Amino acid sequence: MWRWTNRATCLVIRAAATSATPFGICFGGIEKPRFLHRLDRETSGVVLVARTAEAARAGREAFVSGAVRKIYQVLVEGGFPSGTVHAAGWMAGEPDSLVRKRRRFFPEKDGIRPPAGDGDVRCCRTTFRLQARRGPLSLVVAVSKTGRLHQIRATLSALGFPVVGDKIYGVDETLFLRFLSDELTAADRSALRLPRQALHAAGLRLPHPVTGTLLRLRAPLPAEMVELRNSFFS
C-alpha cells in the first residue's frame, strides 16, 4: 500500500508525478504515486507515497492526527545548547523580507503573537536535541510535531542557530536572490559551507495502515553532510 525512498536534494515532489518522472522510477514505476508529505527542495531523506487512493487516505489521516513521528538530522551554525529544547509558537509570513516565501517563528514563551492582519498564521511545535558540538557547528536531531512550511529552518533561525547552507534563513537572505540569478560568489559559497541546506529527513515512525504495526523508516545522511560532519566532529 505504501512505498518509500531516500530522496536526493533538488528532486521536486509534484502531485502530477508519473512513472516517467524520476520519482516514478524511484517507486518502481508506480503510475500515479500519491505523496503523503513534502520536503523542501534542498532537504533530502525519507519520502512516503501511497500506491492507492485508500492507502493515501489512511496515510494522510495518520499525518493529520499526529500519529507520525518525523525525525530530522540537521547541521547548524553555532554552539547549540545541551539537552532538549522545546520550541512551540506560531509560524507566520514575514512581509518585510526580500524573499517572499520566507516565514517567521514567534516563540510562545515570548508572548508575542504574529500581527492580527496576517491570515497565514499556524501553530507549530518542534523538539530539538543536541547530538554533537564542535567548533562553529552543531549536529542536532529535530522532531517536528506539526508540518508547517519551513518550520525547522525558520525556528532554528529564530533561536539563533541557522541551518548550514540555508540561503533563506542562514547568514544572509540576499544569498537566495543571488542564487536565483546564478550570481553567488566564491565568498558566498564559502559562507554557506555546502551547496545545499544541511537538513535531512532521517526517519519516519508511523502505524501500518492495515496491521497497525509500528513502521520505522530510516535514511542515512547523504555523503556531503557526512563529509562536513566528519571534518568537524571526527
Please annotate each region the language model reported.
Residues 1-234:
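RNA pseudouridine synthases
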